[in-house]
Structure formats: structure tokens, C-alpha cells
């Protein structure tokens, strides 16, 4: 605002009004910066002509001219110019105006700069003048300025037009002169080129005559077959020479088309002519060199032919036959006959070398004519493992065939290794099942449902067919061996030798063929430490936990219809004391007893829910719940009924342990730490046993250590 008012004072601007309150608003924001800000020309010169300023209207505010609001934000209306609203000082005489202390007033103290006071006085003098005189003066100045400016513009335009005409005339003369010079030079060049062409044609005719004479002499002495490659070579040379001549004529035509295009500068025209002449001379030299090279090649060929005719040898005959075959191949390639792949019978993608083509599908090169069919059928690769038992022997036979030959198998090795591993483990499991059945049949009678599961190896209780899901889960469960620490199978391949256990969160190496070190036969001395539990254990303290016998039918169904992972796997992690670490945990010893028994981790676990129960139970009193250790007495079936009664009595104490229906419950980290401490302290074991042969309800009895 400071600089605009300064310019308006010098150029007698029209931003003025009669109200004295606008002097306050007209000088707002003037003391913000000591130097005037440079404003663009929109605010200074263009507003001084006839029109009032657009961005800076007559300075008035909503409050009747007080300087609370900036003046350029308000429209120049008649309501604002007349004193409709009372002033700030009239409305609020006691409240000081906070904005006015930074602005200049007529009654200002003299400590402000003298320049601002002079500017303020000039603005007052301009505003006191009537606005009509300012408009008349501006209009008169514009009328005086307009004719002078108009005359100057006309003179400049006329001068520029004359200069342009002279330059255009000079350019036209120069272009005509250049075209004449170019035409003359091209005529000379064409004359020289015609002479050179005549000489070349004469040399070619002489050369052809010599070749014809040599051919006639050669045909008399040799057979007609030996002359065929020579004629083809001549024909190719003639075609190449004609092709070179055609290219040279096309270049000449392009050179002749050049002078029709207008050129602006003489120097560029001369340079272009010189370049064209140089190019033409280079082309002529190249043609001469080509002719000389053709002559040399023809002479050497003729010499070879004459020497071959004098002394024919079997080596030259073989070479000639090779040339004939290469020419036939060239004809095939020029005729664009693409052969088909000998492996996949699809069109070849490109030529690999002189004889072989490349197939994109096989990613190999092949020679058309030599068949190399793939030895392994692709159906075995692409087909998923749906019929598990049928595909495995096919793949095994195909791998043996491939290993007997030198060619590597196209099937990936990882799948074959996994399938071999699965086959070996299945055979090992079947052998162990048969050995175990032989042992148990001699000692005791096996329950019918257990015998059915052992014979089937799969849950086939409802006489249903073996589905695809069971086969897939069987293959996945067999591929991962059990962990030797926690005996869980939820693991994956960690590296070449080790597997990773989810439960232990540690990698482990499978011992032997998937057997853990705890599967060694246990000694009868350690078994004798744990005596069978009788009904006298009901007098234990009330702090011992017990299991509520609920969900009986659900437990039976879930134990029957478990996934094959749980049935083929050994029981999950069971915490044991050091004295009972070697005690077998096989579910087959639930209802009967064998004196010399080596447990098998790969047998189907009937008590999978009981094992998960043993995982989930950890009481606070330092009592451990171990796995499925067998009762020692021969009258175990009689004791089982008493166990159910004692379980019902213990359940009346209100201590509820985990539900039997959760097969996937796990220990927390804190409970694992406590159980590790309790192992070192030697806690009391809890024997979990089934009440009935149908595994309807189970209960764990925790006796006191002093009672037995």
C-alpha cells in the first residue's frame, strides 16, 4: 500500500473521495516496512487511465472508515462510501483501537520519519481536489500521447516491412544461384558416372566370356553334377551385382531430388554439394572394389575346378556333396519351411546353428530328422497325487528306468525323494505292525475295535470307503517324522537332515527310521516302581485335581474319527519324571499288558484325546500328568470300574480339569517352565486309563504319594 500511494501521488491518480475518514484507511499498512515494496505494473500504470483501481477501491470499511479492516477487501459501493455505519471511535470511545497504533494519523507525533509525513500531506492534497479535474487532465494527457505513439508505431512497421522485402529478395536470388550451380555439378557428375558404368559393363562382359569358356572346358572333362554349384555361384554373383547397381541408381535419384528443396543459406548449400560429391565418389570406389573382389573369387573358383578336374580325389567329392546338402538346406530356409520339434512335435522357434533348430517348449536344440522322444510320460508329472497307491509304483519304475540310462530324468528329484521316503516309511510301519500283532496275540486278546484299526491302519469304523482326504493326510503325515523330544508331528523340513518341530520350536534330526530314543524296550525294574492304583486312592487330599467325566459320546466319536495325522503319529508331548522317562507311551497298552514289549510310535493312537488332555493339565501342586502308562495288574478290567467311581467322587470336590473334547489344546510357556522344575523335583505321576473298551469315558486318578 505504501508504494501504490506514492505512485498515485506523483501521477495524480483517481483513487480519492471526499470523506475525511478515508485518510485513515488510505494509509493503512504503511509503516510495516521502511522501504517501498516493488509492485508489478498492473497496480501502477494501468490503473491511472480513466478507470478507477480494481484491487484497491476507495478506502472505506464496514465500520464507517475505521482502520480495523483493510480497505482493499471491501467493494467500492455507495453504502460503504457514505457514512451509514458509525465509526469505531463513536461507538466505543473508551476502547482503544489496537490497529491504529501502527498507522499514521494527521495528528501524529513528530518522532516518525519526515518522509511519511510528506507523503501523508500529498495524499491529503490529492484527495481535496475535485475528482472531475483529475479525470479531465488524464483524458487530455491520453489524447496527446495517443497520436505520437500511433505515428511512431506506423513508422516502425513500415521500416520493418521494407527490411523484410529486401531480405526476401536477396534470399530468392541466392537460392536461384545455388540451384543453377547444383544443376551444373550434377550434370557433370552424371556424365562421369555414365562413363564409369560403361567401363564396368565392358569389364563384366569380358569376365562373363572368360567364365563361359572355362565352364565349357570343364563340362567336357567332368560329370554334369560337378558343374551345378558353379552355375549357382555365378547366378548368385550376378544377382548381387545387379542388386548393387540398383542401390547405386536409387542413391543417384535421391541426389537429383535434393535441388528441388529450397535452401536458406549459401554456405549450407555448398557444403551439401561437396558432401554429395564425396559420397558419390565413395560409392564408385566401393563398386570398383566389389568388382575386383568378384573377379578374384571367380578366378580362384575356376582354378580349384580345373585342379579338381585334373586330379579328382574322394575328399573333393565329399566336399561337393556337403555343398549340395547345404544348398538344399538354404533352399529350405529360404522357402520358410519350419520343421517340427522331434520331442514335443511343435513348430521350431528359430534356427540355432547350421543344422539344428531351437524349440521354445523343450528349451533344447534339435536336428530335424533325428527323433528323441521323452522317456518319462508327462502325465505322471502333471497329474496330481490323486490315486496315491497307483501312481507311486509307476513313478518308482520310471525312476529305475531313468537311472539305468544315461539321460537324466525330466521329473524333479525332490518329488522322487519324498515318494521314496514315504514308501520306505510305509513298509517299515507295516512290518512293525505285523511284529506287534504277533507279540500281542500270543499274550492276550486284542479288543475288536482296536484290531480293526490295526488291520485297517485308517479310521474305517463306519464301513466307509477311504476318501481322498485321508490319502492326502496320510502322505503328509508320513513325510514328517515325529519329534524325539515332544513326539509331535506338526513339523516341516528345516534343511537336508533336520526337521523343525512346531511344539518345541527347535530343529531335530530323526533318529533311525523315524524312531525316537525313548522307544527302546523298557526294563521291568523301572516298570515296577509304579504300582496299579486301587480304590484306596480315594482317600487322597481334596487339593488333588480330577476330571469331570462329561462329553462321553463326543469323546468316543472324536477318538474314532480323528485325523490320520493323530492316528499315525505317536502321542504328543507328555511331561515325565526322570524315573519314568523310559516307560512306554503306546496307546495299545491301555487295556492289556505285555511283559516284553517294544512300543511303536507309528501305530494309530486311540487315546489321542487323552494325550491332548495330558498336555493341557498342569496342576499347581507340582503333580505331573504323564502319558498312557499301562496298569500293572492282570485284573485291570475290574479295576477300571472302580476308577470311574473314584473319578466321580473326586469330581464332587469342584476341581475341574481340561475338557476331553479338545484335541488341540497345548501348554502355555509358564506351565512348561513349572513342569520342568517339577521333573527335577520328582513329582507324583497320574495314570490316565480308559474305562471301557469303546473309550467312552476316561478319568485320571491322582493318588497321594504316601498311600502307595
Curated annotation (Swiss-Prot):
Localization annotation: Nucleus
Chain intervals with Low complexity compositional bias: 11-21, 123-219, 227-316, 516-590
Keywords carried by this UniProt record: Activator, DNA-binding, Nucleus, Repeat, Transcription, Transcription regulation
Role description: cAMP-responsive transcriptional activator regulating late gene expression. Essential component of the developmental switch between early and late development. Binds to a number of CA/GT-rich gene regulatory elements.
UniProt protein name: G-box-binding factor
Keyword Nucleus: yes
Annotated GO CC locations: cytosol; nucleus
Origin superkingdom: Eukaryota
Major localization listed first in the record, in broad terms: nucleus
GO molecular-function terms, A-Z: DNA binding; DNA-binding transcription factor activity; sequence-specific DNA binding
Region (Disordered): 1-29, 123-339, 511-604
Organism (species): Dictyostelium discoideum (Social amoeba)
Polar residues bias: start-end ranges: 591-600
UniProt biased composition (Basic and acidic residues): 324-333
GO biological-process terms attached to the record: adenylate cyclase-activating G protein-coupled cAMP receptor signaling pathway; autophagic cell death; positive regulation of aggregation involved in sorocarp development; regulation of transcription by RNA polymerase II; response to catechin; sorocarp development
Mapped Sequence repeat ranges: 339-368, 481-510
